[in-house]
Amino acid sequence: MNESQIHRGEICLIMATRGRPEFLTEVFAALKSTTAQPDKVSLWLYVDEDDAITRKAIDSSALNDAGVKVNWHIGPNTSGLCETQHTLWRNSGKTAEIFMILADDICFMTSGWDDIIRDTSKKFPNGIFLACPYDPTSADTCTYPIFGRRWLETLQYIFPGHFPYWWDDRWVHQIGEMAGCYVRLPIDLRPIRGKGKTRRMRDLPFWARFFQLTLDERKDSAKKIIEAMNLTPEEKSAALKNLEQHATELEKQQEKFSDLYTIFQEERFTLHTPEERRAFNPGYFKKEADAVALMIQFAQWRMAEKKFADAIKFLDATFMSNIRLRQAIDLKVQCLRELGKNSEADKLAKETLAAWPEMNFFRRIFRFLGMVATEGKTMIIGFLQSGKKPK
C-alpha cells in the first residue's frame, strides 16, 4: 500500500454479526456516545446472506445510527469468523492506519477510546504493533485485537484461518509477545449479556492440541514482524533473544496439556448440544481435514530429520480428531519401528489391518487378471488391424 493512500489516524472496526440486531442497537449507541473523533472511525459489518432477522433490520433503517460511518457486507456463510474478517479487511481498501476486531455483543465503556488507540499508535511509528483493551471475561488473551496496519501488511492476514472458533486471538497474542510489540490499553469493553456461549465449538481437545503444536508457525510470524521493524543489529539481536525466551515458556506449556480439562471447557462454553456437535457439517469438516493434513505434514518433516519421537506427537494429535487416516497410522508404525518399539508397532499395524483390510490375495489375483485382459485386448486389436487391407 502506498503511504499516500493511508488515512492517518483512521480506525477501521471489523465485526461479524448474526441474528441479534437488538445487540447491535446497544453496540451502536455505546459507539456513538464514546467515540471522540467519529469522522476518523469506520465500522464494517459482515452479515450472512441467510440472516433474515439482521437483513430486515438493515432494510428498515433500524441500524443506521452508530455515530460513525457504517458499511454492510452481505455474504455467504463461512466455516469460521476469520473468513468474514478477511473479507471486510479487503473491502475496506486497507487504507486505515489502525484495524480493530470486535464482536457484536461488546460495548465500549471508555470515552475517547479511539484517541487512546491513536496515542498508542504514535509510539510505534513503523506501524507495527498489536494492542488489546481490557476484557473482563478473558484477561490473559488478546480477545479484541488492535493491529497497526503494517502488522497486517507484513503477515498478510488478520488471523491464520486454521480455526472454526477460539484460538485466533491467542494466536496473534503469542506472536505479539514473542515479537515484543504487544501492549494492553486502558479501554474498558463490556459484554451486553455477560460471557456467552461459543458457536461452532466441538472437538476442543483436538483444537487445543493443534494450537500447541503449531507454535513454530507463530515463531516464524514473529520473526517476520521483527524483520519488518527495521531495527538496528543490536535491537534485532535483543528482539530475537526475547522471542526465543517466550517460545521456550510456551513450549513448556505444551507438556501440561490435559484433554480432560479441554472436555470440561467444551461442555462449559459450547452453544451446541451433543447431538448437534455429532452432526456432519461440511464447513467444519473442511477445517478439521486441513488441520489433520497439516499435522501429518509436520510429522513427515520431523521424520525426514530423524526426529521420530517428535513426529509421533503430531500423529497422535490427529487421532484426537474425528478423522481417521490410515496414512497417519502407517507413519506412526514407521516411527515406532525406528525407535525400536517393534511390539507396539506390530500391535498398531494389526489394528490398522482390522480397520482397513488390504485383501492382498485378491488384489494379486485382480492385478494378474487385469494384466492378462489388457495384454489380450492389445493382441486382439493388433491382429485385427494387421488383417485390414489397404484401400
Map each language-model feature to its residues.
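Short beta-strand-to-loop acidic/aromatic patch adjacent to the donor-nucleotide binding site
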Residues: A96-C107
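Conserved donor NDP-sugar-binding/catalytic core segment of glycosyltransferases
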Residues: I106-Y144, R150, C181-R184
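A short, glycine-/small-residue-rich helix N-cap motif at loop->alpha-helix starts
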Residues: P76-T84, W89, Y165-W166
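Short, acidic, metal-binding catalytic loop of nucleotide-sugar glycosyltransferases
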Residues: E26-K40
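Active-site nucleotide-sugar/metal-binding loop of Leloir-type enzymes
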Residues: H86-I98
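A conserved acidic beta->alpha catalytic loop
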Residues: L45-D59, C107
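C-terminal catalytic/acceptor-binding lobe
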Residues: W166, R170-A279, V292-A293
